[in-house]
Each structure stands twice: as structure tokens, then as C-alpha cells.
Amino acid sequence: MNKRMILLMVVSTLGVGTILSSCNKVEPEDEKEVEVEWVDLGLPSGVLWANINIGATVPEDYGQVFGWGETETKVEYSWANYAHGKDFYGLTKYCSDTNYGLDGFTDNDVNLREEDDAAVANWKNGSRIPTKEDCQELKNNCDDQWTTRNGVTGRLFTAKNGNSIFLPAGGYRWGTELDCTRRNGAYWTRSLNANEPGGAWYFGFTEERSYIYFAHRSYGRYVRPVKYTK
């Protein structure tokens, strides 16, 4: 299997795994090496997909959840503490419609900047959150099936070249509650829904199907990074 690998350091803090780059200093008894494999699925764009989520140590781990455009995890996910707006119609960043911006704000940015990309901030290895188009390409060019791996439910995406990635069904977080675990997968793209910019596109799935839809940006969802080769 054609894979490109990096090593990351994971530090356990209050039970939550935090991803740091290998150059960060950590206490030896707390450090743990995590091998991230960049999987070549033979996609037309040449995009490589990571084999684990941000915050995970193995493919079956759910990892960490993030609000759209936020680079740190939180206890609660809501508009009350969202970084880029006060509510669905009170946006302060990433807004393409004056009806959704606070006091008519717009900036017409429809993709996350690197400064607001959780993959860039947490892994620092050239990875990015995938775009809506990256997820559609994955869906179009792989056979995806609902399966269970090591007791964890999710969807397995298998390419024509035989390589595959597993996305666990970790649900999503709204408020302080983690909902739909083991039944739904919900992964952010870095693409804004330009028609309703209070929402952003995510790659979701159930046992029956995978799909791309949009949700409130303040929701907590998982991130599966990609790396571009072209």
C-alpha cells in the first residue's frame, strides 16, 4: 500500500487527547507516538487521506470534535461560545450574504483560511480539512460499506487500487451532549454553504448511505484531514 507517514505526539490532558507536532516538548511519561498514514486511494486529484481523525490514535478512535472554523476543542458547542458569530444570522467571519452577517457584515470567504483550519493548527504537517469537492470525489471513486471494526461501527471506503480508509460513526456534539454515536458519522469540510452561510458542508453517513449536507457551524463534528500532492 502506497502510504506516506508522519509521527505526531499525543498528550493526554484531562482525558482529552491533544495533538501536538513532534517538535513540541512533552513530559516523557505522557508522550505517545502516533503513526499517521497518508493513504493513496488513486483519486483523480491525487489527494491523500489520513487514516485517523484528529485526536485519534488508531482508525477506530473517534478523536476530537471541533466547531466549523475553530481549532480547539470545547466542553460545549453552541452559538453562545462560537468563535465566528453570535448566531446563525449574526456572523462575524465567513459570510457571503448581508442577511446572515452581524450588522450586515460580509467577507465573501467561502473556504476556511489556514488560520482557522483544525488540521493545520493541530497537525502542522501540510494537512488540511477536506473541501466539499474532496469528499464528493471520495464518495464517487470508492465503494463504501457500513461495517464494524474492533467493535466500532462506521463506513469503509475502498478504492479500485485496493487501499481503504475507515471512518468511525462518532455522531456529533451539540451543547454538551454527544448524539447519534455508533449510528451517524459527521465530518466537517472546510467549505461554507454560500447560500446559507450560517451553515457549512459536512460529510455524513448512516448505515444506509453516505451523503454531503450542511449544518450549523457551531456544531461539534470530527475532522479527517487530507494532503494535496498536486
Task: Cite the ranges covered by each PLM segment.
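Bacterial N-terminal signal peptides that target proteins for export
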Residues: 1-9
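Intrinsically disordered, low-complexity regions
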Residues: 2, 16-17, 223
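C-terminal motif of bacterial Sec signal peptides marking the signal peptidase cleavage site
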Residues: 19-22
